[in-house]
Amino acid sequence: MVFIKPQGSDTTWIFDTETCGEAAELINAVDGKKNIVISHFHPDHILNLLKVKYDKLYVTKYTKKYTRAGEIVDGELLFPDGIKISQIPSSHSKGALILEYKDYAFLGDATYCHFRLTAREYNVQLLEQMIKKMEEITAPNFCLSHDKGFVQAKESVLRIYRKILARRKNGSPTINVNDFFNEDGGVKESEDSLGNNVKVKL
């Protein structure tokens, strides 16, 4: 969950709502106008919508099947206060949204893989499209929802997904990444922009 109050604006933007009661209390304690952007439809990102008050809600058509409310974002929206909302292709979930503001792009879970009982996988086509979208983002910092290192350099994150894409096999629509992880969920081979080892959950 992220709160953004652009300078000179009377609106607080909130990216995702989480599920715990404390998060709902924090949202309801915000004074003034509140706009909420939901990254995707998974329960850990939307459940508090039932408990909070807001002025506007932005979702994709897939997410609206679950929220039953909100303005559908098809493509991208740019607001006078500098907030930008857009869709991003994702293997993790259909209908993913990201939020950009100044030097930061909040990607939610969009970069994460698809989880099955026996495999962690990326769809090759969606991964290619996701990387292209990430390359087009002008913000130098990416923020990934569940990572220990919430804020990471754009190029550092891109290197990881380019490595994953390079593992694709001819004729296969998916890339298995089971062996790309440490036991704690961190990526085995990743470095930040300074060459330091970092752990990134996919």
Regions found by a protein language model. Name each.
Residues 15-17, 39, 59-60, 106-109, ...:
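Active-site flanking residues adjacent to catalytic metal/cofactor-binding acidic residues
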Residues 21-63, 138-141:
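Active-site metal-binding motif and surrounding structural segment of the metallo-beta-lactamase
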Residues 1-32, 69-130:
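Catalytic core of the metallo-beta-lactamase
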Residues 128-198:
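Divalent-metal (often Zn2+) His-rich catalytic cores of metallo-beta-lactamase-fold enzymes
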Residues 55-56, 124, 160-161:
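Short, hinge-like loop/turn segments at secondary-structure boundaries
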